[in-house]
Amino acid sequence: MIMKKILSWFLYITCILTLVACGKSAAPITLPQADEITSIDITIEENTVSHSDKTWISEVIADISSSEPTKKESIQDFPQVESYIKIDFRLETGTSTIFAYEDRGKCYLEQPYQGIYKIDRKLFERLKEIE
């Protein structure tokens, strides 16, 4: 009888741990290739700065590519925070937009309907620089 209880608890805990470990994993951020981007426009409130320097674009794309997926979902066109940075990747074929923001002391990128990604503060501060 005691062995049955121990075995039942073991199976129960194993099932729970398996379900938790196999939760939905977020996909990495989807970005255009650096050589396809003609410029990156960064908008903070009403101020927009356009960056067309290929070196700057490549560095920013590399930094953004290293962002870590979170389990948070993006279900809106815009982040649900008061203040955010809009990042428009201008391509010859159109525009791709992501957003950067700070929430509870952590910095994130949000790609509408794709995912939310954690970034380091250094990248966030770089994006905030309006020259």
Residue ranges and their predicted role:
Residues 1-24:
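Sec-dependent bacterial lipoprotein signal peptides
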Residues 2, 22-131:
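Function-determining sites in protein domains
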